[in-house]
Design a protein with these regions (language model features):
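Proteins enriched for Cys/Gly/acidic motifs involved in redox and nucleic-acid/cofactor modification
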Residues: 1-189, 226-227, 241, 262-270, ...
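Residue-level signal for inorganic ion chemistry
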Residues: 40, 73, 100, 182, ...
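Short, acidic/polar
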Residues: 293-299
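Terminal RNA-binding accessory module
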Residues: 325-412
Length: 412
């Protein structure tokens, strides 16, 4: 049979889809969903909107006569509903992904969610269509923020065995991958359950021959400890960190049941910026409790953060979370205006950062889009490159370039 894998959501899901592709036997992986016999939907459920996207995709696949299997976070939150409504042939949990061949060969409809707290030690040897490799180092989260459903669908925080991670990255390096991205539900919690730490793991990964750059997924402010700070001058560590704030009002952080404190966060971000780091964050606009007064407090604080990258979005209630039981204080129009305000601030910050840090850039070229090759530098800024050579998958040093609002531009 021809199998198509449709992946929604985060880097963790990208990794899990690659595990399934690497585990599939006796069937053909298809890159064209219209020609597939079977579609495996690796779903995201972080918002109600994400659920809708998955549901709409499945409805379309059904209309086209495809046999559909559902996995990922949505299998836990919406799997039974979709199964009972006859939308999917089978539903299986993330812990079952290595059994993908057996699963798609089933002739009887089924639900098998497995154990969401199972330790998973999968190894991916190759990432087709990617210039960098994603490496999942842990699963689950113990933070239980008021707006988030992920702990209930990904389980408690548990670390992947260090020896398996090292073996996996060695295999990837031997297969030509020189940049890795560490991913997971909450990667900063790595090692808490195994008497080690993310910093210790990073030191060992950096010693693997062939690895030039290590990028990190999202960290929490409390996870940037002294041990981690000792690594900040290492050349192999990406000069960009994504640290989840979610908000910059002390009151809102309490309502959200967050562990971070706004004024401590400002101190941390300024310390990291002084080391030359580009800094990104997440921000939820319009969460219940965000009054005009609280918004102004948050905005004033936000302006004091040296942010260069931003993943911000307007709050939408997520079923089965505490926040969904609270009254929304902000209308949609106002929330979008607040979102635009934050985006404009960070866009200008990023522009000024690139002008201030006009250095030689190390770029891994990922692909060609139109007239330009594109890739990302160590600050996680996109660069557009004109060249007569095929630069795809190559590292290049960029010494001269033009800085524009939308990115950096060069000829090579």
């Amino acid at each position: 049979m021809k199998i198509y894998f449709k992946t929604f959501g985060c880097r963790t899901n990208i990794y899990d889809s690659e595990v399934m592709k690497n585990s599939l036997k006796n069937h053909e992986i298809c890159d064209d969903e219209t020609k597939a016999d079977v579609i495996v939907v690796n779903s995201c459920t972080v918002t109600n909107g994400a659920d809708s996207d998955v549901r709409n995709y499945i409805n379309k696949a059904n209309k086209n006569g495809k046999k559909v299997f559902l996995t990922g976070c949505g299998a836990i939150s919406r799997g039974k509903e979709l199964f009972d409504n006859g939308k999917v042939f089978g539903v299986f949990g993330s812990s079952k992904k290595e059994n993908i061949t057996e699963i798609i060969e089933k002739n009887i409809k089924f639900i098998d969610l497995g154990d969401i707290n199972k330790s998973q030690n999968s190894i991916v040897k190759n990432f087709k269509k990617y210039t960098k490799a994603f490496v999942k180092i842990q699963e689950g989260c113990d933070f239980n923020c008021s707006y988030c459903i992920i702990p209930s669908v990904r389980g408690h925080a548990r670390s992947k065995d260090e020896s398996i991670i090292l073996k996996e990255v060695l295999n990837l390096a031997n297969n030509g991958f020189s940049e890795i991205v560490l991913t997971g539900t909450n990667i900063g919690s790595y090692g808490k359950d195994t008497r080690t730490s993310l910093s210790k793991l990073l030191k060992k990964l950096s010693q693997i021959n062939g690895i030039k750059r290590i990028r990190l997924g999202s960290l929490e402010p409390s996870q940037i400890d002294d041990e981690f700070k000792e690594l900040l001058n290492e050349k192999w560590l990406e000069k960009h960190l994504h640290i989840a704030l979610q908000h910059t009002s002390e009151t809102m952080l309490k309502i959200m049941r967050r562990r971070n404190k706004a004024f401590k966060d400002i101190e941390l971000f300024n310390e990291l910026a002084s080391k030359g780091y580009a800094l990104g964050t997440d921000f939820i606009v319009g969460h219940p409790g965000e009054s005009d007064k609280i918004w102004l407090e948050a905005l004033n604080n936000f302006k004091n953060f040296p942010l260069t990258h931003l993943h911000a979005f307007v709050y939408s209630p997520r079923d089965n979370t505490h926040s969904a039981t609270l009254k929304i204080d902000v209308d949609g129009k106002t929330a979008k205006e607040r979102l635009k305000t934050l985006q404009d601030i960070v866009e200008q910050n990023n522009f000024e950062f690139r002008k201030k840090h006009y250095n030689e850039l190390n770029v891994l070229v990922e692909q060609k889009n139109g007239d330009f090759f594109t890739g990302f530098d160590e600050y996680y800024n996109k660069i557009y490159i004109k060249s007569d050579k095929d630069l795809t998958h190559n590292w290049i040093k960029v010494k001269k370039y033009e800085i524009e609002k939308r990115g950096n531009f060069t000829n090579f």
